[in-house]
């Protein structure tokens, strides 16, 4: 299966843009999102899934469970079930969720 950019659904949240390549409605196994962070992503707690961010370009920082790390191209960040995270900077990232997630799999904390 191939999914092209023109087949994705985009959600512009202002601080970041998300393009949904594979959603929970399409697959229970995983969800895949291209994220373009413009400024920041609010603090979030994961519920019932693992979320991974692969940095494609740009730079910034991630805070996972109150520990801050710099983010550069080709870095991978892994957020497990129950962990909190937020990020900031100007970055392009691939987000992978296992199993697939929707709004029931995270809690916005700020």
Annotate each language-model stretch with its function.
Residues 65-82:
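Short acidic-glycine-tyrosine-enriched beta hairpin
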Residues 49-50, 108-110:
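Short intrinsically disordered coil segments
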Residues 58, 74-75, 93:
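Short hydrophobic/aromatic patches on the structural cores and recognition surfaces of FHA
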Residues 81-106:
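Ligand-binding loop in jelly-roll beta-barrel domains
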Residues 37, 45-62:
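Short, conserved beta-strand element in jelly-roll/cupin
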Residues 1-31, 41-43, 109-110:
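A short, N-terminal "cap"/entry segment at the start of jelly-roll beta-barrel domains
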């Amino acid at each position: 299966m191939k999914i092209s950019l023109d087949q994705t659904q985009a959600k512009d949240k202002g601080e970041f843009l998300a393009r949904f390549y594979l959603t929970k409605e399409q697959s229970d196994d995983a969800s895949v999102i291209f994220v373009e962070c413009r400024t920041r992503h609010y603090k979030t707690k994961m519920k019932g899934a693992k979320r991974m961010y692969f940095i494609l370009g740009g730079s910034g920082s991630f805070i996972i469970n109150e520990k801050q790390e710099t983010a550069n191209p080709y870095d991978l960040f892994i957020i497990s079930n129950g962990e909190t995270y937020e990020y900031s900077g100007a970055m392009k990232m691939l987000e992978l969720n296992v199993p697939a997630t929707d709004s029931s799999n995270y809690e916005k904390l700020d």
